[in-house]
Amino acid sequence: MTTKLIAGNWKLNGSLAKNAALIDELRRAEMHCVVCVPYPYLAQAQALVAGSLIELGAQDVSEYEQGAYTGEVSAAMLVEFGCRYVIVGHSERRALFGDSDQVVGRKAASALAAGLTPIVCVGETLAERELGEVEAVIRRQLQAVADCVGGEALPTLVVAYEPVWAIGTGRSATPEQVAQTHGFIRAWFSARCDASAVRILYGGSVKPENAAVLFSTDDVDGGLIGGASLVGSDFVAICRAA
């Protein structure tokens, strides 16, 4: 398996001053990581990460290439600002902004067409877990993406398993739960492509205190980090735990 991938999702946070301080801390620590910053800060971040081990990502992308789509940002635009990765299907986009499985699939296809690597987020709610629907939910989410990107593109995806009930709650899934679900995701890909090439990240209340255990769990190839990615010392500690 390839080197573990650690991506920070800044969400709706940051300022010019805070961004500069945070990226400077990551540069000084010589961290190899991805930072997914809000759109307005992409130009600043592109300049700040130049010549470092830090790679740039965005938090969402339009399914459309261009045209009369007010407020949208295309994959080609992200590439011009140095992005290599883009998150698609984050649970907050699905729940708050109505991104359906099909929209997520089209966004992933749009990203791939422009040369971006999509970080495809999948995961279940607490109610779905309690009903025993974890695998059914993730199977549906993955299949919608596969239908849009095609089988040949599957090995190029990054998948982030984010149990919705563990995001921003301080409650992380147990290593056993993570191993079981990541194993299911790996098996799903194995039936369709070379699954060894697919990086499967865990996202959901990853902290310096639990990162090493989570990252040593079977089929965990890194993490998609939310709140802890905004604190330089915490994010550095998480990256080093990988």
Curated annotation (Swiss-Prot):
Keywords: Cytoplasm, Gluconeogenesis, Glycolysis, Isomerase
Transmembrane segments: none
EC number from the UniProt entry: 5.3.1.1
Pathway: Carbohydrate biosynthesis; gluconeogenesis; Carbohydrate degradation; glycolysis; D-glyceraldehyde 3-phosphate from glycerone phosphate: step 1/1
Protein name: Triosephosphate isomerase
Species name: Azoarcus sp. (strain BH72)
Record text on subunit structure and interactions: Homodimer.
Pfam families xrefs: TIM
Gene: tpiA
